[in-house]
Amino acid sequence: THSSMMVSGPYRLPIVTFLKEQAAESLMHAQLAGEKIAGLDGHPSQKIAKIEETNRHTIKDILEESLEHELHALNLYKKLLSSVENKSIYLEEYARAQIGEEEQHSLELKIMLKDFS
């Protein structure tokens, strides 16, 4: 949500809405992952992944940082998929669904960034 506070300019309103939706969805993904971990007799971490502050706040910079975040999440879900493949259909399906969502978000951000090329 920090990024959404830093957006300025004529595209502010739709981009702020988009970034807030992404933040809410990230929280939902974390809660879902925690539920899966707890359901498998694990202990979900209370740590929050650090998001590096670059102090660059143009719309292009914010969207590029968001894209990097999505691509990082995509790689983590791909690693999860490779570790659970042929071991748990349930976790495979979960990982595949998350990969699909992250790919969709990445594509949306790439399209948004085309205006800044």
Whereabouts are the PLM-identified features?
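Iron-associated oxidoreductase/ferritin-like identity signal
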Residues: 1-117
